[in-house]
Structures are given as structure tokens and as C-alpha cells.
């Protein structure tokens, strides 16, 4: 794993001409704006300027590259908030900044030190730098920060100080009606604000004061030192921009000498043409710090105090040598808590070897008590090697840990070819340490991963990660057909690789790589894929382990370029068919190229060999392929607004909030959340006074016991097996799917007149919704019956390797006191249900392989029992119930999972209210219908 340079300083404020990185995060870009549009990226711009790409110096000796450049907004967020200087008082000896935030007299530092401050705030600078600059205080010239020059060497300085005479009395000569520009009148500098800034009214720090002209007879022209193209950065060491220059100059009390600090135009131009020196490589833990924020050191310390370990052991010991710990090929971390687990490794080796000989099956997991704390251990054996991962039971359930170790083994094979190649090479140890550092922080501190996200988003991501992070699929975002067509066209053009330098006719030689496929992500969602299922899952699991999708979700990526050789299982596994007429994979090498830009992330799988040239040695990323992938992302700049509209739209299918179904007193009505889904359908109509769409308490509706479906009413396959689900103390598991109807929960509701109209009853909606709106409502309502009772869902399509579930925006609309706990219980329960499904699928596959089914096909085996269904009934009540005279209201809901073995393997998990009988097949049909890539 290559190190992570945070290269925010590479981008000059004005940007290099033709450099794609200079165009990042252009919020003022408008296709119809001739000024802003003139700087848009073109694929041939880098060729015309012959500039080295900014990531070139970060390529490692083995050809790997991991280059991450923060977006401009992210750089600003990492800096401590410092207000712009608006008012100063000039005197002969000092400049006094009159701001409340400057009580200690600390002056606002110039922008050239912004990147240094980022590194210092993230504690990424060496200690000697902090010591060297610890004594700096007071307003000093920017020139004093420059390094000492050698004698006899003439250097064009980047900054220069120019002293001019300023006379504010000139203002009395100007006409009263004329708009004063103090920069022109007092200093004699003409600065023309960009038209795009004037049009959008962009505020904030303002733009840089570039000298576009000099006023004849002005002080700047008389000095002879100010040139057109210089940039005014400070007045008497007070930073100025177009936003505050007029206010700063207005504070000059009378005629006096003023020091102006400029960035030298000639030096800046010369600097851009000089070859860049090798940048200092930062530690790979910088990605950890970027993801977990300023509290990363405290988080890491808490994790080290928690017992957890990963070990790679060998079962073949050399009896002649008695070397201590010779069976340990790799272990992480090195801490007191993990040392105790490491000391009992002999137990794990004995269990793995002995039980396999006795039972004939491999050990998958075990549990032990360490300091009265239960620790789960997961096993993964290959040949004579054993991979072990141990985590606390209170943090990671056992079914989740089994899935996690499978993902780890799969990812390491994808990156290194085999587990032996990963763990048995000394040069891989630092990379593995970084890999497992991210792994354990994701497992033990999931809520801290999204440090900049809202609390509700953090809670949803943490609760859903139990299930979603280990599903054999990628999170899919359904989009309108016209958007899908644009995305498919863009990826197809890239994959064709028959234009410009990618064409074999361009250089009259065989192309370097063949593009096997690509997949496009937006804000962490898969929106388009042209990859086979196995390749898609391999790449998605790699991105998940390195937390790349959360970075793109919050526009933290200014530019991301990743390049490495990979070993996809789909292409490297030997073919089972010996027929020569069947297609055989070429003996080639495979490379993964990932390019990120703002919210987009495009993953491309390349093949060297076969139709393309053979790769020799450890090739690094080719600039032409990187530029073409960037160009594809730039072509999609206009699509993101429509994707955001889809994310901000009403949930499809419609969801309900659990708090709306609470059966309680009239006083609890005020605490219910307004339904955003139905409010969109109501539009301009007014059903009642604001708020218009509150959930009534079913006061006119008697809740009946849910009737179990035939598959849920009994039988050997109907029960919920496996481990229990960790639930809230306020949530009780009322009835398993195998329970009888007599033990079901009966909710009794006092009948009284409804305080507000029931928005879920179509009888009330018919008066206010048009026929078209009713059609829309019925189309997006997933459940059957007159009322929408669906709370949450997850649908897994294993053939295509995707799953769909409500987006973060959709879940954020359904806030409440009970709903977040319902979502947490849903994912934990689905994890246990899916563990049962995995056993069922394994048994079916084993039957087919053993020849018990003569046809050898999965379809005929599954036709005897095509559907498996498991469900749990929950009852929950509000946590903080203050009314001692009345019992807290109770709400019952089902979590049901259904496994489809025919015609293709699919899984559906739904959570809905207990009041209405649901048909899971109907819901599955609606959800899966038209779900194609």
C-alpha cells in the first residue's frame, strides 16, 4: 500500500493552464458562461503543455500508486475558522486588528501558509518543524518566512514588499456620486473582478487581488516595483482579498507610508515551469487520520485497550528447531490486550487440527473468556496455513465475524494473489499493518468513521454496517432510464478505447492494456457497472476496506488516483471445462485503476497480455489511461445535479416511520414527526392546518393479530435458528416465526375521534389527490392493503452482485424516538436470519456436488422447496416515558427474511407493522421487477 500524500498545496490558487486538478470543485462553472467555461478541461490540454501529472512522484518502486488530493472545500474545513480582517487601526509603530476573535493579538496568517496549517492541525508535520516555528509571534513580513539564500546565487523571490505613500485626502477631490474604489484612488492599482464572481455573488474569503492595470500617476506606478500580474496579498502584513480590501484601506487615518506585499508574477510563472522536486512522502496512517478526524489518537488508544487480534499461523512446525513463536507468520496489533490472545494460540491450532480429523469438517469459529469478556475467534484455513481474527462479542456478533474473515481473505487474495504472498513477504508488513488498522477501526468504532456526517447518518451507517458491509453485493441506486443511458454511453465510449492515444493506429503499435470493464460510483452508491459480478464484488470489497466510498460521499475528494496490480478470481481460477472450444482466459496480468473526482469514483479493470502488450516488471499507471478516465468523469459533470434530485426525491418504495404507529395518548401526538412522503403527494392542497400530514394513532382502527403465512406457521424450516439478536432493553422479541397464532401480540387501542386525518388511509386522500397522484402513490407503495406499513427493507440480487436499500436521505426523513432503534434491530435480526439462509444454500450446493440430484442442477433441487422464510415479531415502546399513570404505548412489527432459490438466488428482508397481513412474494416481485444494471 503506497503512502498517502495530502497534496492540497500542489494546486496554485490560479491553477495551472490545462491542468485538470486546477479545475476541481469549480462551483462557479456554468456551461453558458464564456468566462468560466473557457477554463474547462480538455483531454489534450495536458499534452500541449507537457506537464508532469501531479501524482507522478507518488508512484512506488513496485508500480503501485495511492494518491489522494483533498477538495478545496475540505481544505477549508480542516483549517481553524479565522474571520476575515474587516477593520484595523494603523499607527506609526503597529497595526491593531479590532476583532473580538483576536483578543490575544494573533494576526491572521497569509494564505501561503494554509497548507502548512492543515498539516500542523492534522499533526502530520515532523516535530522539528513545530519547534522551529514555536517562537514566531507578532506581525512580521512575509519575506522573513523564506529560506536563507546562498551567497553568490541570484534568486527571484516569490514575494516582495513595496512601500508607497498613501494620502486619504485624495478622496475629497472625487465626485460624490462616483462609486469609490480605494484600491484605485489610494494605491493606483486596477483590479477587475471576475464576471462569474459578480454574477453569482460569491462571498466568503473573496478572490485574489491580481494587478490587471496601473493607474497613471498612481503611487503603485511611481514606485516602479509593481508589475501587471502581481498579486496583492497583504497591506502592512494584514491579509487582503477582494472581499475586505476596501474596508482595510478605509481604516487608514491620514497620509502615511504603507507596506504592500505582492506575490511576484515573474517568480510564480518561473516556478510553474520548473520541474517539481520529489515531495516528502507522508505516512500511510494519514488516511486513518483523514477518515476519523482529530480524535484519531484517542480512538486508536481505546482500540488498543480492547482485546482484538489477527494472526497468520502455520500448521507445519519444524521439530528440529525450537524457535519461539516460529508458527507465527504475522500478527497485529502489538499491544498488551492482543498479547494475551497471542499467548493461547496453541489452543486454536489444536482445535483446528483435532476437530477436523474427528468431524471431517473445518472449524469456523470458537469463543473464549478473557478477563470476563467473551471473545469470538474466526478461522480461515488454506492448505497448511491458518488465518485467525479475534474480536469482542459485545462489539461484533459471531455471524458478522464469519463474514468479515471471508471478506478479508477475499480482499487479500485480490490484492496479492494468495494469502501466502500477502503474509510471507517482509515488504508487505507495513501495508498489512495499515490494512488491519483500518479494518479494526471500522469494526470497533463504526460510528466514528464519518466524523463530518450528521449524528443520524453516523447512527444509520453504524447500525446497517452489521449486515450491509458483508453482503456479497454493492449498494445500487436506481435511476431514471435517461440517466442510465447517458452513464452507459460514457462508460462504453471509454471501454471501447478506439480513439486518440488509446487507439492502436495512433502509435502504430499494440495497445498497452485492454479495458475489461468499469463501474461508476456516486456518493458511495453504484450507479453504473459493466463488470462481471465477481470482478464487481472484488473491487467493491477493496474500496470498502480502504474506506474510499465514505470519502466520495462527502465531496472530500479533489482528486484520487489508485493503481495496483490485482488478481481477480474470475479470471485467474482454472477452467473446469477441458473442452478446447470453450473460451480460455489468456495468461495475462490485471491492473486496477481508480480515479475519483468530487462525488464520482470510476473503477476500471485493465488486462495486459492477450490482445494487449505483455506487462514487463512492475509498470506504473499510464498517463494516457488516467487522463481518459478523468475526461469521462468531466463529461458527467452535468449529470450529478439530476442524480442529486433522485436522492432528494421521495422514497421509492414509500416508507413509514415507526413512531407514527404508536398507540398512545393524545398528548403524544405533538411529538410525532411530519410525514415528508405524504406531504410531497399533497402538494398545494391543504387537508388541515399545518402540519398537514401527521400520522394518526390508528384511533379509529382496531389492530389485529398478524396472521402467520403458511410457511411461517410451523414446520422444521420455519423457525429462527442460530444466535439470539442483541436488542434494546425496551424492545422485546415477542414471537418467532415458528410460534403459534395464540401467542401473538394483541394491541388494544381506545376508540376515539381522530385528531388529524389519517394520511395513510386512501379514503381521506381521494378528496385531495388527483388521479395521477393516486397512481404514483399506489405504484411506489410496496406493501398491500389500504395503508403503507413498510418500515425498512434490503433486497439482495446475488446474480448481478447488487443490493438495494433505503438511501441515507430517505432514512433521514423518518426521524423519531423508536425508528432508529427499529433500524438497528432490523439489521441485527437480518444478520441472524441470513446465517440460516447461508446454511441452507451450502446444503443445497453440497447436495448438487455429491450427485444426490441426478440432473446436477440447482433448479431441480430447489424446486422441491423453492422458498425459505424466517421472521421475528418485536414489540417496542418509547425509551423515555414520563407519564407514570399510564403504561407506555406499544408497537409491534415483523422482521421477515425470504430466500429465493429459483429461478435465481435472491434474498429479501423487510420490516413492517403487524397490523396488516402482507404477501412477501408480492413485495419481492415489486422490488425485483426491472432491477437490472
Swiss-Prot record:
Major location category of this protein: cytoplasm
Low complexity bias: start-end ranges: 710-719
Positions of modified residues (Phosphoserine): 675
GO BP annotations listed: cilium assembly; establishment of planar polarity; limb development; nervous system development; regulation of smoothened signaling pathway; vesicle-mediated transport
Region (Disordered): 1-54, 703-742
UniProt keyword annotation of Methyltransferase present: no
Location in the cell: Cytoplasm; Cell surface; Cytoplasm, Cytoskeleton, Cilium basal body; Cytoplasm, Cytoskeleton, Microtubule organizing center, Centrosome, Centriole
InterPro entries: CCZ1/INTU/HSP4_longin_1 (IPR043987), CCZ1/INTU/HSP4_longin_3 (IPR043989), CCZ1/INTU_longin_2 (IPR043988), INTU (IPR039151), PDZ (IPR001478), PDZ_sf (IPR036034)
Name of a matching Pfam family: Intu_longin_3
Source taxon at top rank: Eukaryota
Biased composition (Polar residues): 37-48, 729-738
Domain PDZ: 186-264
Keywords: Cell projection, Cilium biogenesis/degradation, Cytoplasm, Cytoskeleton, Developmental protein, Phosphoprotein
GO cellular component: cell surface; centriole; cilium; cytoplasm
SUPFAM superfamilies: PDZ domain-like (SSF50156)
Statement: the UniProt record of this protein carries the keyword Lyase: no
PROSITE patterns linked to this entry: PDZ
Membership in a protein family: Belongs to the inturned family.
Subunit structure as annotated in this protein's UniProt entry: Component of the CPLANE (ciliogenesis and planar polarity effectors) complex, composed of INTU, FUZ and WDPCP. Interacts with CPLANE1. Interacts with NPHP4 and DAAM1; INTU is mediating the interaction between NPHP4 and DAAM1.
Function: Plays a key role in ciliogenesis and embryonic development. Regulator of cilia formation by controlling the organization of the apical actin cytoskeleton and the positioning of the basal bodies at the apical cell surface, which in turn is essential for the normal orientation of elongating ciliary microtubules. Plays a key role in definition of cell polarity via its role in ciliogenesis but not via conversion extension. Has an indirect effect on hedgehog signaling.
PANTHER family in UniProt: PROTEIN INTURNED
The protein's name in its UniProt record: Protein inturned
Native source organism of the sequence: Bos taurus (Bovine)
Amino acid at each position: 500500500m503506497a503512502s498517502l500524500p495530502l497534496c492540497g498545496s500542489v494546486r496554485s490558487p490560479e491553477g495551472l493552464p490545462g491542468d485538470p486538478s486546477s479545475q476541481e470543485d469549480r462551483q462557479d462553472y456554468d456551461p453558458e458562461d464564456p468566462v468560466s467555461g473557457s477554463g474547462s478541461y480538455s483531454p489534450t490540454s495536458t499534452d500541449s503543455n507537457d506537464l508532469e501529472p501531479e501524482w507522478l512522484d507518488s508512484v512506488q518502486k513496485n508500480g503501485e500508486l495511492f494518491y489522494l488530493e483533498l477538495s478545496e472545500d475540505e481544505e477549508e474545513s480542516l483549517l481553524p475558522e479565522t474571520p476575515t480582517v474587516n477593520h484595523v487601526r494603523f499607527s506609526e509603530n503597529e497595526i491593531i486588528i479590532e476583532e473580538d476573535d483576536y483578543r490575544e493579538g494573533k494576526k491572521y496568517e497569509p494564505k501561503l501558509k494554509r497548507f502548512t496549517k492543515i498539516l500542523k492541525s492534522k499533526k502530520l508535520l515532523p516535530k522539528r518543524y513545530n519547534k522551529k516555528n514555536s517562537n514566531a509571534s507578532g506581525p512580521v513580513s512575509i519575506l522573513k518566512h523564506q529560506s536563507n539564500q546562498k551567497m553568490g546565487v541570484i534568486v527571484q523571490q516569490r514575494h516582495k514588499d513595496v512601500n508607497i505613500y498613501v494620502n486619504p485626502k485624495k478622496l475629497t477631490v472625487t465626485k460624490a456620486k462616483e462609486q469609490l474604489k480605494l484600491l484605485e484612488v489610494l494605491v493606483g492599482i486596477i483590479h477587475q473582478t471576475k464576471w462569474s464572481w459578480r454574477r453569482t455573488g460569491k462571498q466568503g474569503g473573496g478572490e485574489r487581488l491580481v494587478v490587471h492595470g496601473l493607474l497613471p500617476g498612481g503611487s503603485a506606478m511611481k514606485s516602479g516595483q509593481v508589475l501587471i500580474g502581481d498579486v496583492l496579498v497583504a497591506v502592512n502584513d494584514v491579509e487582503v482579498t477582494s472581499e475586505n480590501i476596501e474596508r482595510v484601506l478605509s481604516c487608514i487615518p491620514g497620509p502615511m507610508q504603507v507596506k504592500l506585499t505582492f506575490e511576484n508574477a515573474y517568480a510564480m510563472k518561473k516556478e510553474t515551469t520548473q520541474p517539481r522536486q520529489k515531495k516528502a512522502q507522508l505516512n500511510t496512517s494519514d488516511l486513518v487520520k483523514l477518515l476519523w478526524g482529530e480524535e484519531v489518537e484517542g480512538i486508536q488508544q481505546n482500540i488498543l485497550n480492547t482485546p482484538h487480534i489477527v494472526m497468520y499461523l502455520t500448521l507445519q512446525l519444524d521439530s528440529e528447531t525450537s524457535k519461539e513463536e516460529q508458527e507465527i507468520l504475522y500478527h497485529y496489533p502489538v499491544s498488551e490486550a492482543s498479547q494475551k490472545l497471542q499467548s493461547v494460540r496453541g489452543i486454536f491450532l489444536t482445535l483446528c487440527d483435532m476437530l477436523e480429523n474427528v468431524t471431517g469438517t473445518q472449524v469456523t469459529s470458537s469463543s473464549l473468556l478473557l478477563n470476563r469478556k467473551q471473545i469470538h475467534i474466526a478461522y480461515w484455513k488454506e492448505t497448511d496455513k491458518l488465518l485467525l481474527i479475534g474480536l469482542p462479542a459485545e462489539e461484533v456478533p459471531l455471524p458478522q465475524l464469519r463474514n468479515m474473515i471471508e471478506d478479508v481473505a477475499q480482499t487479500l487474495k485480490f490484492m496479492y494473489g494468495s494469502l501466502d504472498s500477502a503474509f510471507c513477504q517482509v515488504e508487505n508488513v507495513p501495508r498489512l499493518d495499515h490494512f488491519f488498522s483500518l479494518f479494526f477501526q471500522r469494526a470497533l468504532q463504526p460510528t466514528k468513521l464519518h466524523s463530518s456526517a450528521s449524528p443520524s447518518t453516523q447512527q444509520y451507517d453504524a447500525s446497517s454496517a452489521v449486515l450491509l458491509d458483508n453482503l456479497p453485493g454493492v449498494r445500487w441506486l436506481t435511476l431514471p432510464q435517461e440517466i442510465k443511458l447517458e452513464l452507459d454511453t460514457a462508460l462504453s465510449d471509454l471501454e471501447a478505447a478506439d480513439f486518440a492515444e488509446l487507439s492502436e493506429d495512433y502509435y502504430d503499435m499494440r495497445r498497452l492494456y485492454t479495458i475489461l470493464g468499469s463501474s461508476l460510483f456516486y456518493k458511495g452508491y453504484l450507479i453504473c457497472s459493466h463488470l462481471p459480478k465477481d470482478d464487481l464484488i472484488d473491487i467493491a470489497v477493496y474500496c470498502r476496506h480502504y474506506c474510499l466510498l465514505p470519502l466520495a460521499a462527502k465531496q472530500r475528494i479533489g482528486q484520487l488516483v489508485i493503481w495496483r496490480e490485482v488478481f481477480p478470481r474470475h479470471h485467474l481460477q482454472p477452467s473446469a471445462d477441458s473442452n478446447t472450444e470453450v473460451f480460455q482466459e489468456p495468461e495475462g496480468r490485471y491492473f486496477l485503476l481508480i480515479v475519483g473526482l468530487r462525488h464520482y469514483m470510476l473503477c476500471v479493470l485493465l488486462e495486459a497480455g492477450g490482445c494487449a502488450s505483455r506487462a514487463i516488471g512492475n509498470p506504473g499507471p499510464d498517463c494516457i489511461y488516467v487522463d481518459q478516465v478523468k475526461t469521462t468523469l468531466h463529461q458527467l459533470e452535468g449529470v450529478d445535479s439530476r442524480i442529486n434530485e433522485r436522492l432528494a426525491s421521495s422514497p421509492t418504495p414509500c416508507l413509514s416511520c415507526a413512531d407514527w404507529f404508536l398507540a398512545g395518548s393524545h398528548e403524544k401526538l405533538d411529538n410525532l414527526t411530519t410525514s415528508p412522503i405524504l406531504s410531497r403527494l399533497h402538494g398545494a392542497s391543504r387537508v388541515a392546518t399545518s402540519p398537514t400530514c401527521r400520522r394518526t394513532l390508528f384511533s379509529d382502527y382496531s389492530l389485529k393479530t398478524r396472521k402467520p403465512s403458511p410457511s411461517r406457521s410451523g414446520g422444521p424450516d420455519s423457525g429462527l435458528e442460530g444466535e439470539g439478536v442483541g436488542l434494546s432493553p425496551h424492545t422485546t422479541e415477542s414471537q418467532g416465526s415458528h410460534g403459534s397464532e395464540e401467542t401473538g401480540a394483541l394491541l388494544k387501542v381506545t376508540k376515539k375521534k381522530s385528531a388529524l386525518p389519517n394520511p395513510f388511509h386512501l379514503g381521506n386522500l381521494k378528496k385531495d389527490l388527483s388521479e395521477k397522484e393516486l397512481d404514483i402513490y399506489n405504484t411506489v407503495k410496496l406493501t398491500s392493503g389500504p395503508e403503507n406499513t413498510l418500515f425498512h427493507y434490503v433486497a439482495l440480487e446475488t446474480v448481478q452482485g447488487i443490493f438495494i436499500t433505503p438511501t441515507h436521505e430517505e432514512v433521514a426523513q423518518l426521524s423519531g424516538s423508536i425508528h432508529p432503534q427499529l433500524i438497528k434491530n432490523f439489521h441485527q435480526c437480518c444478520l441472524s436470519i441470513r446465517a440460516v439462509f447461508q446454511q441452507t444454500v451450502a446444503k443445497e450446493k453440497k447436495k448438487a456436488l455429491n450427485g444426490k440430484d441426478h440432473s446436477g442442477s440447482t433448479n431441480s433441487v430447489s424446486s422441491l422447496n423453492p422458498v425459505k422464510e424466517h421472521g421475528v415479531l418485536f414489540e417496542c415502546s418509547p425509551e423515555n416515558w414520563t407519564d407514570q399513570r399510564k403504561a407506555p404505548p406499544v408497537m409491534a412489527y415483523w422482521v421477515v427474511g425470504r430466500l429465493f432459490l429459483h429461478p435465481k438466488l435472491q434474498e429479501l428482508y423487510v420490516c413492517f407493522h403487524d397490523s396488516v397481513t402482507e404477501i412477501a412474494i408480492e413485495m419481492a416481485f415489486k422490488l425485483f421487477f426491472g432491477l437490472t444494471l
